[in-house]
Every structure is written in structure tokens, then in C-alpha cells.
Amino acid sequence: MSNTQKQLALAKAAKKSVNTADTEEKNRALLAMADSLEAAAADILAANRQDLEAAAGKIPESMTDRLLLDGKRICAMADGIRAVAALPDPVGEILETSTLPNGLEIVKKRVAMGVIGIIYESRPNVTSDAAALALKSGSAVVLRSGKDAFQSARAIVAALKTGLAQTRIDPDALQLIEDTGREGSYEMMRAKDYLDLLIPRGGAGLIRAVVENAVVPVIETGTGIVHIYVDKDADLEKAIRIVRNAKTSRPSVCNSMEVLLVHEDIAADFLPKLERLLVRDRIEAGLPPVRFRLDPQAARHIGGEAAGADDFDTEFLDYILAVKTVASVEEAVGHIEAHGTHHSDGIVTENRHAADYFTTHIDSAAVYVNASTRFTDGGEFGLGCEMGISTQKLHARGPMGLKELTSYKYIVQGTGQVRE
């Protein structure tokens, strides 16, 4: 048995301590984990510095931001755990009840998933978010961090386990796979005897590898090739605010806009204003400018590189924005259907017909009208922290909170009935 299999077996053996814990016990564990995380801040920051030093010069600046921890972010992680503790416990919720003509009483009840596996990349905060959500939803959790964030993840898990050890929940219910090589991931993908669910969080390559190779049931958290379409009937000042926020507030995350579609009737007015805000004003403020990848029509109005064949199919996760002009809302929808990833897409318009057409025809987990796509987030949706953004339709779609991490079973109460 490999080390990874041993860790999977430990999690499976410990799951009963979580599955059978009541709400008070789970909340007590989460609060202890949050306190322990803050108490271990110095150790976590030291480990994070090791990760940052190892990654220096190897990853883009925007990705470094995802990897970076500081005291404020550790406090935010701890507060995120406390926020999960404050959420209603979904386990045990009665979803449906019915009584059959023969007198059988059927109850559909929400139950824990069992053991959840998470494979993720360079975001240390996923470690605490995933642990909190899994444990509150009644499941043990097995984490596999990317190499870039491994030292940070190890220090975070050590702190969380210290907190768990003060409660009745077995600390073995939280595991961090030590094998950061490819084989560690593939062992998790094949661990059908140990894992009830596997969730990948990361770039397109990771997600594709998990979806194509896993025998464990998977919820796909797709990449975010996020579009915003600025319609001819848009309020341009509103559009400017939305586009700036969607692209520059945090470009390294999956709900950040990657493609801007602009109606050709307003391109000559709108695009130069946007260029001034996203390029010249940012340079003057000492901030990274947005670099445009332009189709030929957009290039008539602003400066930038000519868009390549793949630019409208790329999740940049950087200060790069692909820009295309379109002749109608129908053309915008057609482009998104051809190039989108069903994550988050939005329209800016004051035309109700255009908005209704867009929301009806765009098949994404979150569709926005006159708002930034950056709101696709468990916390913003009132779910607490999230396990990821599901872009599939089965079991879960959009931000995955506690309910999305549970299953259900039927309890059938009889008085001696037999089937004829």
C-alpha cells in the first residue's frame, strides 16, 4: 500500500467521527480550527515564504498574488471558517415526505457525502475553505495541493489538525497528500474504494486530466473564460465601472473577465474611454496596465496586439483582455456559445429585450445583467466560502456551498407491509 493509499484509508476510517457528529460538535471543531489557524500564523507565513521563494521568476505576477499569504489573509481564512460554523447545518434536513396508499411513509433526508477529495493548485486559502466546508457538511476530506503551495498547505493543515485534536472529531478526517507528483493525483483519481467525490480546482490542464482519468465521481469546476457584452443600449459610465472591476480587481481568479464584446455602434465612443482608464490611468498610478488583444474592428479604435487564433479561447488569469466588436446581441451570444466555458457571462444594457434574450440564451452557471462577474463566489452569494464553481449541470452548478457537498437517502417506515 502506497503512502497515498494509507492516507486515504485513514480518512475513510475517520469519516464516521464526522458523519455522526451533531451540529454543535462540528461547529466546536470549526471554531477550534479557526483559533488554531490564527495561533499558527507565524509558522504559516514562514512556510508561505518558502513557496514564494521557490516560485520566484517561474510564475506570473498575477499568480504570485494567489500564492501570497499575509496576516490579513490568514485572519480572513480563519474568519471564513467561523462563517461556515455560523451557517445552517444541511445534514439531516428533510427534503420531502410522502405516504403511499399502502401506508408506507417515505422520507427523503439530506446526508453527508462520506469522503471528499480535492485536487487544487496554487491557492493556500483553498486548504482551509475546503476543510471547513467538507467537515461542516459531515464528510472527511483528502486534500492534494499543487507543488507551488505545498509548504503553505502543510502548515495550514497542521494548524487545523491541532484544532481538531481538541474536539471529538478524529484529526485523521483531514488529510493532505504528501505526494505532490503526478502519481499522487492519479492515485486519488483511481481511489474509488476510498473517495465518494473528487473535485478539481485549478487550470484547464488539471481539470481536463481529472475529468478524463478519474474513476471516482467528479464535479467539474471548469475554467472561467468569462465574457461581458456591452450592448448598444448600455449606460457607458456603468459599463466602464463594471468592465474595470471585472478585469482588474483580481485578474488571477476564475470569475475575472477574459473577453470583452462591444457593440459596433458604440465602439468608437466606448473603447477609447476604456483604454484611458485601463492603460494610461493605471500606468500613471503605478499599476499594471491591461494589455489588449484586439480583433481588426476593435483595433481601429484603440491600441494593442492583434488577437491570435487562441486568444478568445484562453483563460489568461492576468492583465490581458481579448476584445471583439459585434453587430448584435445575437452575435454576442453566438460568440459566447462558441468560446465560453459556461462559468459566468454578463451583459451591460438598458434594453430589457436584449437583457432577456441574453439571459435566456446564455447557458452559464451565472448570467449577469448590469453587474460585474466578480460576484460569482460562495461568500458573495451568501453560501459562506465555496468548494469551487461548478460548470456542469448534474448534482451541482455554480458556487458549491454546504448543500452541494451532500447527498440524500430515503428512509421508508412501515408497519409490516410486504410487496405482493
From Swiss-Prot:
CDD domains: ALDH_F18-19_ProA-GPR (cd07079)
GO-annotated biological processes: L-proline biosynthetic process
Catalytic activity: L-glutamate 5-semialdehyde + phosphate + NADP(+) = L-glutamyl 5-phosphate + NADPH + H(+)
Any GO CC annotation of this UniProt entry: cytoplasm
Origin: domain of life: Bacteria
Biological pathway: Amino-acid biosynthesis; L-proline biosynthesis; L-glutamate 5-semialdehyde from L-glutamate: step 2/2
Protein EC: 1.2.1.41
Main location: cytoplasm
Subcellular location per the Swiss-Prot or TrEMBL entry: Cytoplasm
UniProt entry tagged with the keyword Disulfide bond: no
Keyword Oxidoreductase: yes
UniProt function note: Catalyzes the NADPH-dependent reduction of L-glutamate 5-phosphate into L-glutamate 5-semialdehyde and phosphate. The product spontaneously undergoes cyclization to form 1-pyrroline-5-carboxylate.
Protein name: Gamma-glutamyl phosphate reductase
Protein's organism: Neisseria meningitidis serogroup C / serotype 2a (strain ATCC 700532 / DSM 15464 / FAM18)
Gene (UniProt): proA
